[in-house]
A protein has these predicted regions:
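Transmembrane helix-loop junction
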Residues: 34-35, 75, 84, 119, ...
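Long, hydrophobic alpha-helical segments
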Residues: 32-33, 51-71
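Aromatic- and glycine-rich beta-strand/loop motifs that create alpha-glucan
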Residues: 1-25, 80, 242
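Transmembrane helix boundary and interhelical loop/hinge segments in multi-pass membrane proteins
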Residues: 12, 66-88
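Alpha-helical transmembrane segments of multi-pass membrane transporters/translocases
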Residues: 22, 33-34, 203-243
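Transmembrane helix segments
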Residues: 32-40, 153-195
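Short hydrophobic, aromatic-rich alpha-helical segments embedded in or entering the lipid bilayer
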Residues: 2-4, 180-211, 215-219
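Alpha-helical transmembrane segments and their short interhelical loops
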Residues: 92, 100-163, 215-223, 231
Length: 243
């Protein structure tokens, strides 16, 4: 297991550019929009910046789940590394755990860097408990994006997988309210947005940070989506292995 984690660490160091871009782009968006979007209501303005910080953190994490995670699995499938592991004495669960450790490191980096920018540059103020629980909620809700990433791996063409991943990346962000409040959309669009897992992931985190309320319904919806996506991915993977 230790050797597998070391391999993932080396691979991560070789893709440092992608790593920095996945965090840097949301940070830039956060700095630009938090400085340009102005509300007449002082209370709304004060609530907007920490809320936007949290949604941009989730946006960054979704990038790792939709691009880095499926890409590294697809590459291992292509270069027969997965086949080698399957025929080695190593349990296959250790292979997947090493992948999750790598993605978790990316997630934690996103949280640490975006939170640091929010606190040090934009003056976001939250209690220690609010910072910690917000980070934990972001990690929990990221499960649904990882499940979508597993679905993307089932696409055999790397080019098609990249196109679908990019489409999902921006659709989930926009329809989930990561870039702008869903309330600004027409009513019929809002109804669609409220069906999105990204919407409920954002609602769960931002509502806790703003009001201290825990939206159990949103948590259950996010976990429900994750279970459904994971189930479909496992079924498709099993069918692919049987062919």
């Amino acid at each position: 297991m230790k050797a597998l984690v070391q391999v993932e660490a080396v691979k991560l160091s070789r893709s440092l550019g992608v790593f920095l871009l996945s965090i840097g782009m949301p940070v830039i968006f956060f700095l630009i929009f938090s400085s340009t979007v102005q509300f007449d209501d002082v209370t709304m303005q004060k609530a907007f910046i920490p809320s936007y910080m949290l949604t941009m953190t989730g946006f960054s994490m979704s990038g790792f789940a939709l691009f880095t995670f499926p890409t590294m699995l697809a590459e291992d499938r292509k270069n027969s590394w997965l086949t080698f592991i399957q025929h080695s004495p190593l349990p296959i669960w250790q292979y997947y755990l090493s992948k999750l450790v790598r993605v978790l490191l990316c997630f934690v980096s996103s949280i640490a860097i975006v939170f640091a920018v929010g606190g040090l540059v934009k003056g976001v103020e939250m209690t220690a408990q609010e910072w910690v629980i917000s980070a934990l909620l972001l990690l929990v809700t990221s499960i649904v994006f990882l499940a979508i990433g597993l679905l993307l791996v089932q696409i055999q063409s790397e080019q098609a997988m990249s196109v679908v991943a990019n489409l999902l990346y921006f659709v989930l962000a926009i329809m989930g309210g990561s870039w702008m409040p869903v309330s600004l959309f027409p009513d019929w669009v809002q109804r669609i947005c409220k069906l999105m897992p990204s919407y409920h992931a954002n609602q769960l985190v931002t509502t806790y940070a703003q009001e201290g309320d825990f939206l159990w319904k949103s948590l259950l919806i996010v976990l429900g989506y994750a279970i459904i996506f994971l189930g479909i991915a496992l079924i498709l993977n099993r069918k692919s292995e049987q062919q």
